[in-house]
Amino acid sequence: MRIVFMGTPDFSVPCLQALIDDGHDVCAVFTQPDKPKGRHGVLTPPPVKELALKYDIPVYQPKTLKTDEAKELFKSLNADLAIVVAYGKILPGEFIHAPKYGCINMHASLLPKLRGAAPIQWSIITGEKRTGVTSMQMDEGLDTGDMLISKSVEIGENETAEELHDRLSSLGSEVMRETIAELQAGNLHPVKQDNEKSTYAPILTKELSKIDWNDTAQHIHDKIRGLYSWPGASGEIDGKVIKIHLSRLAGACSGKPGEIIESGKRLVVSCGDGNAVEILVLQAPGKRAMPVQDFLRGNPIEKGAFFE
């Protein structure tokens, strides 16, 4: 099958690798433009581009898909199918309808839940117990197309967004392979999404980082896990913004919201529902992240102090 692949970050790589391994004719890869990275702003290609070049697959990196030039280029590829995995751009209708079998997207949620840019992180932040990957026949809406195949996984009680990302990235290639096989066999049965059951997973911003210690311990723990490793959850103490990378639930307590009720071998903070979270890894401004005991040796926090 002649396939155009559209994807950008690490999450997309297993799907492209699977297409190559399965012997499909990947006639082109569309990915985001190279971006400056690091202290010196070195122009760095996306992970998908690096893999494509390794296999001599033509790579296209248009800044926009809205130009006639981009639309004509895509149409000229005469693809049977486009596979879209975390590409990072909204596809115009001319792209969606150009391939023989249209465009199929691998979305990292159990649609119609968590449509949008950050479904992995929001599945944890919102306390979901299960999530997964859904293949979807793309239309011109935002993750509103007919569902094809989905597979689900349980979210671990201490699992971070980064860990879940890696699991769903692998699962995505399984869903993609099954979707293509069923498409070729003529066995796909698209199911319309129930819009009344849809939820939204907007892009993450730094403004989400601040922890509200009046919230429940479970919600705070979920936020810390869901925002790991970017933008990261944070709390302010003694005028310093401290990033909190890892935590776990610590049971019932009698402190006030944000109060440090234990400090030394452990760092335990009271939350708004009479339960506490234990902070495991944290980071001072301009420093590296470190385990709590190492952190407290250089940045002592007294029992009875408060996170704001």
Residue ranges with predicted function:
Residues 214-308:
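An anion-binding loop in the catalytic cleft
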Residues 7, 29, 52, 82, ...:
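A residue-level signal for conserved active-site and pocket-lining positions in enzyme catalytic cores
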Residues 2-4, 27-28, 58-77, 90-108:
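Internal alpha/beta domain cores that form substrate/cofactor-binding pockets in large enzymes
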Residues 13, 42-45, 67-71, 89, ...:
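Structural motif corresponding to alpha-helix initiation and N-cap regions
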Residues 22, 32, 81-200, 207:
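Donor/substrate-binding cores of folate-linked one-carbon enzymes
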Residues 35-55:
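N-terminal beta-loop-helix "entrance" segment that forms/cooperates
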Residues 1-39:
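N-terminal Rossmann-like dinucleotide-binding module
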Residues 202-215:
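Acyl-group handling in specialized metabolite and lipid biosynthesis
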